[in-house]
Amino acid sequence: MAQDERAAGGDRCPRQAHRRARPVSAPASPSPLELTASDGRTLAGLVLEAPGARGALAINGATGFRREFYLKFAGYCARRGYHALVYDYRGIGASARRPLAAEEARMSDWGRLDMPAALATLAARFAPLPLATLGHSVGGQLLGCMPNHALARAHVMVATSTGYWRRQRAPFRYLALGFWKLHGPLMLQLVGYVPQGLLWPGESLPRGVFLQWRKWCLQAVPFGPVLDEELRDSRYAEVRAPLLSLSFSDDPIATPAAVEALLASYPNAQIERRWIRPREAGVRHIGHHGFFSERHRDSLWRAALDWIDARCA
């Protein structure tokens, strides 16, 4: 079941979302929280607890983004009444093993093991509060790999799509192709991982993460069918909860074609699509990760939390 709300032509404007927002409580400070995945791997998390909380939110990040990138948004969620958890996937930031060339993490581990650990931690720590997830890019792609996805009442996807390079916007897609075919493989030969640098501004990527990500981005196969041996136990068709997809017209990665290809992998979810132009949020640019800028606190952030409120109240 899909409900299509497009930003052009009479949709709810994000700038008006503050009219429906609930009162904001006192700010929260992050506290360290160690997560333990089902395979025993520990992950570095930070939790922001909300006074008088009415729910809890797991924030599943994008590839190469550390947990600290999401702290301002998590703080806003806590002020809105949601315990918020941010964390680093295995192989990334504070959850990486050193030397990074010896790190064995794969991208599928994030969906099969790490994201479930985050949700399970919230369930154990904050029961019986309702749970939700918010996934940025790969954090939404791999929702269907989570064996415990049904613990959450609702899911928000931000700039989430397939990574297939041909669905991306030119000239970005040609830069991406160069990254997959030339830069990444060369770095693996030289140092054993893909380091942070001019051609890859994100966190350094372990070999297994890069190679699996590369494989997925060079083929058009959707996430529902088998992409990889490690995704054979995926549960995309089992996701039935409400799902909000937030996409942005100036995002060169999560284009309409790429977003729709990803959402097709969730055939039974209650999907609501919002295609947002930057001017709808009162800005010139949002792109692939601009949603998490604090300037969107009274527009995009409020709209996302209002949507979660309506499903977790």
Language model features with spans:
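Alpha/beta-hydrolase-fold enzymes
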Residues: L134-V221
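Catalytic active-site module of serine/aspartate enzymes centered on a nucleophile-bearing elbow/loop
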Residues: I276-A313
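Short beta-strand/loop motif that positions the catalytic acidic residue
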Residues: V239, S245-S247
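Alpha/beta-hydrolase active-site loop
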Residues: E104-A124
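Short alpha-helix in the alpha/beta-hydrolase fold that links the catalytic acid
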Residues: T255-S265
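Active-site glycine-rich loops that stabilize anionic/oxyanionic intermediates
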Residues: R54, A62-F65
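Conserved alpha/beta-hydrolase
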Residues: R67-F69, A74-P99
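N-terminal cap/lid segment of alpha/beta-hydrolase-fold proteins
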Residues: V24-L48
